Design a protein with these regions (language model features):
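Alpha-helical transmembrane segments and their immediate juxtamembrane cytosolic regions
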Residues: 1-370
Length: 370
């Protein structure tokens, strides 16, 4: 249940980070989302890593679970974006093509905008495959967890160094850099599970105090710990800043998750959010769009939202309406970004059940012996 709470916080950080303010839970900037939130996801996923048979069957299993939904929703959003551009006057997203349908989900992932968060799915798939290969090779060093983590850390350090050297342009393709940068955090999940969790017994108050002090000192030492993993840019903090910052953030929120776990276990909504992180990552921008549609209708009816910008709605992918300039309304986008994907997940789950019932074959009657 601790990791349910951890996933809950991680996905809330992701959605909040995509709103206009994007800093509701950063502790006044001490834990900036873009310095750790995707590492937090990778860490949680790594904690639950397990090999699934042979390497080939392992890859196929992960592709079925991650890539098939990715491509399916990419098609849905591509068609939806085309319809909105053709009939709704929108200027967001790129046209349908073989590239946007087949290659863009893995080399970019931000092309149709309304499913922008889906770029993370292919790197996560690659991380799982790479780490599976490393675990199979770990027999060479007798499955020593420290060595396994170091082997996973080295590619990440190299990738971050290349990002830092490249400035505003990554020196290697995004589909190579993204998973390599995430790999140490994913490996850290298994390191924690197999070597550190049993020793994680320090009392909470001194534990959190030490982590906060170290994080504050790191923030003073490093100019900016935040970076843009989606584009592999703004890595001014270098490998040490990236991974030390991620480790301290994970340590902090892992202990917070332990405190929240009993309460999360009693909340159906919290559990639902933590169990549907794929759907929320995929659809939260559409949740923002749905809320903007509500404001648009209110504006057209003259009920409220008189300063809602229809032009910005149609041309700006990140447009969040602030009624009367009150940015506090940003929380509505956070709520919409969490609840709308849950509704999508609920509907798709019901459709899957219905499809299975329709396609389920009835047992063939045995031939009569007479």
């Amino acid at each position: 249940m601790v990791f349910r709470a951890l996933y809950l916080m991680a996905i809330v950080f992701v959605v909040d980070g995509h709103t206009t303010l994007g800093d509701m839970f950063t502790l006044d900037g001490l834990f900036k989302y873009y310095s750790f939130h995707l590492m937090l996801f990778a860490f949680g996923a790594g904690y639950f890593f397990r090999m699934r048979g042979s390497l080939a069957s392992d890859i196929l299993s992960r592709a079925k679970r991650l890539l098939l939904p990715l491509y399916g929703w990419n098609l849905v959003y591509g068609i939806g974006a085309a319809v909105l551009r053709r009939f709704g006057g929108f200027e967001i997203g790129v046209p349908l093509s073989a590239y946007t349908l087949l290659l863009a989900p893995i080399v970019d992932g931000e092309h149709f905008v309304w499913n922008l968060g889906s770029w993370f799915i292919f790197p996560l798939f690659c991380v799982q495959v790479i780490y599976s290969c490393i675990r199979r090779a770990a027999k060479i060093w007798k499955d020593n967890e420290i060595i396994t983590f170091i082997v996973s850390l080295i590619p990440g350090v190299i990738a971050v160094s290349l990002c830092s050297a490249g400035g505003d342009e990554p020196m290697l393709p995004l589909f190579v850099m993204r998973p390599l940068i995430l790999l140490p955090a994913y490996a850290g999940g298994m390191l924690y599970k197999n070597a550190l969790e049993a020793r994680d017994s320090m009392p909470t108050v001194p534990y959190l105090a030490i982590v906060v002090i170290l994080r504050a000192l790191l923030c003073v030492r490093v100019e900016n710990l935040a970076y843009l993993l989606s584009n592999c840019t703004y890595f001014v903090c270098g490998p040490f800043g990236v991974y030390a910052g991620a480790a301290l953030s994970i340590a902090f929120f892992l202990r917070i998750a332990r405190l929240l776990a009993p309460h999360v276990a009693k909340s159906r909504l919290a559990l639902s959010i933590s169990r549907n992180t794929f759907a929320i990552m995929m659809h939260h921008y559409m949740g923002f769009f749905a809320l903007n549609c509500v404001f648009l209708v209110m504006n057209m009816l003259g009920i409220w939202a008189g300063d809602f910008s229809v032009r910005s709605f149609r041309t700006q992918a990140h447009y969040n309406y602030a009624p009367g300039g009150h940015a506090e309304f940003n929380v509505l986008y956070l709520i919409a970004g969490l609840l709308f994907p849950l509704a999508v997940a609920f509907v798709t789950d019901r459709l899957k059940v219905l499809f299975r019932r329709i396609t389920k074959k009835r047992p063939v009657a045995a031939p009569s012996s007479g």
